[in-house]
Amino acid sequence: MIRTVQLSEIRENIKEMCIEANHFLSPDMAEAMKQAQQNEKSPLGKQILGQLQENLEIAAQDMIPICQDTGMAVVFLEIGQEVHFEGGSLEEAVNEGVRQGYVEGYLRKSVVGDPLIRENTKDNTPAVLHIRIVEGDRVKTKVAPKG
């Protein structure tokens, strides 16, 4: 059975994921950071991990990026072979989601469109897009800012 997915949903999800990935660690990563600080033997190492933990808390509380280098948006899509997209181009929807996420999230724009010309796109597009076709009728999306 074919399932129709609106590209506006993909765009909105990617926008939100760009903002979230730059402001918060996933719960498992946040827990790993706490464990690393607790298990660290070196006083200097403990202090540095404590500063990183404080940075994470400030970023979440004040809605500022965890790191000033918000990097390139790398988008991973697993698309079920029973999925049909409506509403335009998948690549354009992904890039528009990245554009909106980086603009609305007040994230640093540092991507160049052509590496030889070195002109900043001012919206962090184009995204690096990895697509995998899988069985089923679902779309799984992951966004990783790579700074």
Enumerate the language-model features and the residues they cover.
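Non-transmembrane, aqueous-exposed alpha-helical and coiled segments at domain scale
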Residues: 1-147
